């Protein structure tokens, strides 16, 4: 849909409006009594969420490519049907195709003080060229003083669908050097910065002193980002996710400014590798992330 059609079907005066940037990407601008947010139609990609009276919770690189067909650096990319590189020997875009395809906005309504949005993605020319047909994705966002993200995968095929998925959230922090993450203390992890070695559980909060890319399998734990310099805690709860990934590149990237990496941290809601999902024909699987902000008063 173009902006006129989106506005006609889904616009809510003072709450939900649609805009186009020079590259042609369209985004939804959300204002509720308790938060503001931005979601691009490409990738159903949330790039901003800010509860009233708080600093932004979601990080977006100022160097990010906001171009059709290119991934956005920051926000909440949706990885599907694989996480990171494809594993079956065939080529495909990093983190799959879902984040670089236009989704369809199917529902928008204000329920109390929260805005409910639903996006869908059906098979596309790109997905079929990569061997993926007969699936359905439904992505629900509940935007208010807290944020709920719910990704449902449906299998319309007559054979099982094996897939990986992630809500690859970039959180905004004041200084990653002063951030700790709790919740993963009892969990061993795969260290992608050290030749995929399996490392034992640290039994201590996670601190950041260099390039970090850790895959924590077999965990459903709630994580808390303690942003000391920002005097707040970001609570990340998840459902039907058995993998958590923690990432910071510790350097500039082509689409990440030289002084930006210390302002971000990814804590990702994932099902990947040994926790990949095998979905029977006619069945659906829903993974959820719920985030909230708590002020640090000490």
Which stretches of residues belong to each language-model region?
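Beta-strand-rich recognition/accessory modules
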Residues: 1-33, 42, 124-128, 213-298
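Extended, loop-rich substrate-binding clefts of extracytoplasmic carbohydrate-active enzymes
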Residues: 17-18, 92-143
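Acidic-aromatic substrate-binding/catalytic surfaces of carbohydrate-active enzymes
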Residues: 33-91
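Asparagine-centered strand-capping/turn motif at beta-strand->loop junctions
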Residues: 39, 151-157, 293
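Beta-strand-rich interaction surfaces with strong enrichment in secreted/lumenal proteins
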Residues: 67-68, 107, 138-140, 275-279
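Beta-strand/loop-rich accessory regions of lumenal/periplasmic or secreted enzymes
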Residues: 70-96, 182-188, 195, 204, ...
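Hydrophobic core residues within well-ordered beta-strands of beta-rich domains
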Residues: 137, 147-149, 285
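Active-site/ligand-binding surface loops and adjacent short beta/alpha elements
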Residues: 158-162, 166-242
């Amino acid at each position: 849909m173009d902006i006129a059609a989106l506005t006609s079907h889904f616009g809510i005066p003072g709450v939900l409006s649609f805009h186009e940037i020079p590259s042609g990407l369209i985004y939804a601008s959300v204002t509720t009594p308790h938060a503001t947010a931005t979601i691009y139609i490409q990738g159903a990609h949330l790039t901003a969420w800010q509860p009233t009276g708080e600093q932004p919770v979601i990080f977006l690189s100022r160097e990010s490519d906001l171009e059709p067909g290119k991934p956005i650096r920051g926000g909440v990319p949706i990885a599907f049907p694989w996480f990171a590189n494809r594993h079956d020997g065939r080529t495909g875009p990093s983190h799959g195709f879902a984040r670089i395809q236009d989704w369809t906005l199917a529902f928008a309504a204000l329920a109390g003080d929260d805005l409910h949005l639903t996006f869908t993605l059906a098979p596309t020319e790109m997905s079929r060229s990569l061997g993926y047909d007969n699936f359905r994705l439904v992505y629900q966002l509940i935007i208010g003083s807290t944020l709920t993200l719910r990704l449902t995968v449906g299998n319309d095929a007559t054979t099982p669908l094996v897939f990986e998925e992630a809500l690859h959230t970039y959180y905004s922090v004041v200084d990653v050097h002063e951030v700790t993450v709790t919740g993963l203390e009892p969990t061993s992890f795969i260290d992608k910065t050290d030749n995929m070695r399996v490392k034992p559980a640290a039994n201590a909060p996670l601190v950041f002193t260099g390039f970090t890319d850790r895959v924590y399998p077999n965990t459903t734990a709630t994580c808390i980002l303690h942003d000391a310099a920002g005097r707040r805690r970001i609570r990340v709860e998840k459902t039907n996710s058995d993998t958590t990934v923690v990432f910071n590149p510790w350097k500039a990237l082509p689409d990440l400014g030289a002084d930006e990496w210390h302002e971000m941290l990814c804590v990702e809601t994932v099902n990947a590798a040994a926790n990949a999902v095998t979905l029977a024909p006619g069945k659906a699987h829903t993974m959820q992330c719920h985030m909230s902000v708590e002020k640090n008063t000490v």
